[in-house]
Amino acid sequence: MRMEAGEAAPPAGAGGRAAGGWGKWVRLNVGGTVFLTTRQTLCREQKSFLSRLCQGEELQSDRDETGAYLIDRDPTYFGPILNFLRHGKLVLDKDMAEEGVLEEAEFYNIGPLIRIIKDRMEEKDYTVTQVPPKHVYRVLQCQEEELTQMVSTMSDGWRFEQLVNIGSSYNYGSEDQAEFLCVVSKELHSTPNGLSSESSRKTKSTEEQLEEQQQQEEEVEEVEVEQVQVEADAQEKAQSSQDPANLFSLPPLPPPPLPAGGSRPHPLRPEAELAVRASPRPLARPQSCHPCCYKPEAPGCEAPDHLQGLGVPI
């Protein structure tokens, strides 16, 4: 309650400590204007500056000659704050700025009031910056007998705007068919991206179709690449099997089995025998003109058949 001149006021000591405890009424001198309220109202928000002010002597504050607490703030915005603590609603005059009330609410640390004012300011900003609605217009040409049916069947947000009589273009016998131009409109609901909901849905569906088509093309390309790779591998294998140069690259044959009664033959023996068999016989020495000088030293010691006639001494 704001104290006005000529009004009856509680005793001067109502703002201070009375005998036996604190008084019920509290005076607040805000910027030269005295407000009178109850201690219960000020203690509505436990974490606020006003609640701490009237709960004890922890928060030191000066007082005037009447015992009212001195608060150096603007009294213009203190009235809505005090009313909010009384009934929990924010009531502002038309000429009162919400920014000023918000500044005072932050000073007094009244959390619920701060949130309410910020929400209201955001709503106003959104309303101011909101894009005005846009309309799409269509002009339909119809005959008189079709006009009633067309207007009655309009739906999906289309609205009749104007009807223009353009006379008759055709003459069938004695009766003329009057024709009209019917102007209809539809509101486009804007989205945060600046597109209407209908156009955004169409754009989205088109993008999805393009993505699906691109995915299908990529899958087809992968399958074709795999088929070409398989065909190339098969062709390469066929060519390598027909090339005689690749015969040497065949895997080695397994070793022959062990003989029935012994160990495995030495690997070099077959080659040695083959070399001996394949080696040419020694050339016969030319026959000397001298008679054979072979003379057996003892009877019965004759030269072998392949050495007879060669003149080789024994």
Curated annotation (Swiss-Prot):
GO terms for cellular component: Cul3-RING ubiquitin ligase complex; cytoplasm; endoplasmic reticulum. Homopentamer; forms a closed pentamer. Interacts with CUL3; interaction is direct and forms a 5:5 heterodecamer. Interacts with TCHP. Interacts with CUL3, as part of the BCR(KCTD17) E3 ubiquitin ligase complex, at least composed of CUL3, KCTD17 and RBX1. Substrate-adapter for CUL3-RING ubiquitin ligase complexes which mediates the ubiquitination and subsequent proteasomal degradation of TCHP, a protein involved in ciliogenesis down-regulation. Thereby, positively regulates ciliogenesis, playing a crucial role in the initial steps of axoneme extension. May also play a role in endoplasmic reticulum calcium ion homeostasis. It is linked to Dystonia 26, myoclonic: A form of dystonia, a disorder defined by the presence of sustained involuntary muscle contraction, often leading to abnormal postures. DYT26 is an autosomal dominant, progressive disorder characterized by a combination of non-epileptic myoclonic jerks and dystonia. Affected individuals manifest myoclonic jerks in the upper limbs during the first or second decade of life, and later develop dystonia with predominant involvement of the craniocervical regions and sometimes the trunk and/or lower limbs. InterPro entries: BTB/POZ_dom, SKP1/BTB/POZ_sf, T1-type_BTB. Residues 208-225 have a biased composition (Acidic residues). Its main location: cytoplasm. This is BTB/POZ domain-containing protein KCTD17. Residues 196-239 form a coiled coil. Pfam families: BTB_2 (PF02214). Keywords: Cilium biogenesis/degradation, Coiled coil, Cytoplasm, Disease variant, Dystonia, Ubl conjugation pathway. It is found in: Cytoplasm. Highly expressed in brain. Highest expression is observed in the putamen and the thalamus. GO terms for biological process: cell projection organization; endoplasmic reticulum calcium ion homeostasis; positive regulation of cilium assembly; proteasome-mediated ubiquitin-dependent protein catabolic process; protein homooligomerization. SMART domains: BTB (SM00225). It comes from Homo sapiens. Residues 190-268 are annotated as: Disordered. GO terms for molecular function: cullin family protein binding; identical protein binding; ubiquitin-like ligase-substrate adaptor activity. Residues 24-94 form the BTB domain. It comes from the Eukaryota.
